[in-house]
Amino acid sequence: MGFDGTRAGRYDAPPVFTSSTLDHRARKIVAWVAGLNLLGFFIELIVASIIGSAALFADAADFLEDFLMNLLVLTALGWSLASRRKASFGLAGLILIPAIAAFGTAIWKMISGEPPEPLTLSVTAIIAMVINLVCAILLMNLRKADSALMRGAWLAARNDVLANLLILAAGVVTIFWFSAWPDIVVGLVIGVINLTAAKEVYEQARAEDPELEMDDDDDD
């Protein structure tokens, strides 16, 4: 039964989602989520560059990671194992870019002591939280799918809302305590999470053995 099957699906096994089996509705949902995450990435990257926020740089990496994850759900699952392995290495590298920017900004803030503009930081955090809430709601119908990527995409959107709350808290605290430390602390926390994510993607890519795919092809 497909994603929109007409029979009672309450007791059916959850559908297996891949790039080839995603039905029209599910693919449309994932595509929208990917687009929203890309929008959030550019918004936070631009604002972070303007106000010098370590937290926003770190959260921009989260948006980039989620965009690439959803893009892989739509496309890369249909690739060969070797191609997916190369894509995973590239994904890990891309995630590192904003994360490194977050650490660099945090170090600069420690030296200069200049805090980001708190109102802009807070408003941007609210915008990012709205984007992540919309993504979480869109993915809610797919969260029980028998696919680690699909469930991971939903969990990532849900967890990103919590990260946005941390950034919003940093902005509010900075309004009353004009210091760079709230932004620095939140930026470092989210940055560490991003480094861990990049490390996991890299290690998973290394663990995938293209020879296994060749063996499977020989058995067919």
Label the predicted regions.
Residues 2-220:
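Alpha-helical transmembrane cores and adjacent cytosolic helix/loop segments
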